[in-house]
Curated annotation (Swiss-Prot):
This is Large ribosomal subunit protein bL25. GO terms for biological process: translation. HAMAP family: Ribosomal_bL25. It comes from the Bacteria. One of its GO terms (cellular component) is cytosolic large ribosomal subunit. Keywords: Ribonucleoprotein, Ribosomal protein, RNA-binding, rRNA-binding. It comes from Enterobacter sp. (strain 638). GO terms for molecular function: 5S rRNA binding; structural constituent of ribosome. It holds the Pfam family Ribosomal_L25p. This is one of the proteins that binds to the 5S RNA in the ribosome where it forms part of the central protuberance. Part of the 50S ribosomal subunit; part of the 5S rRNA/L5/L18/L25 subcomplex. Contacts the 5S rRNA. Binds to the 5S rRNA independently of L5 and L18.
Amino acid sequence: MFTINAEVRAVQGKGASRRLRAANKFPAIIYGGEAAPVAIEMDQDKVWNQQTKEGFYTEVLTIVIDGKEEKVKVQAVQRHPFKPKLSHVDFVRA
């Protein structure tokens, strides 16, 4: 079971996303189900280390946002063209 911490994004847009990436974080979103979509930010190093493990893309993940757990699966991943970094991840509620 994978557990990842995240924070709700206060500011959205291209400039805010670039500032996140410069701070070694990246934007992501959780959508699906009855609840509204949630824009989040995640730590680059922690998620990169998790995504190299075998079941990251197939198993149900737990994302902890402000103490509340969300069960999700990875829907789409955008990676940097040549750096070992994630640009954006879409999660769908499980």
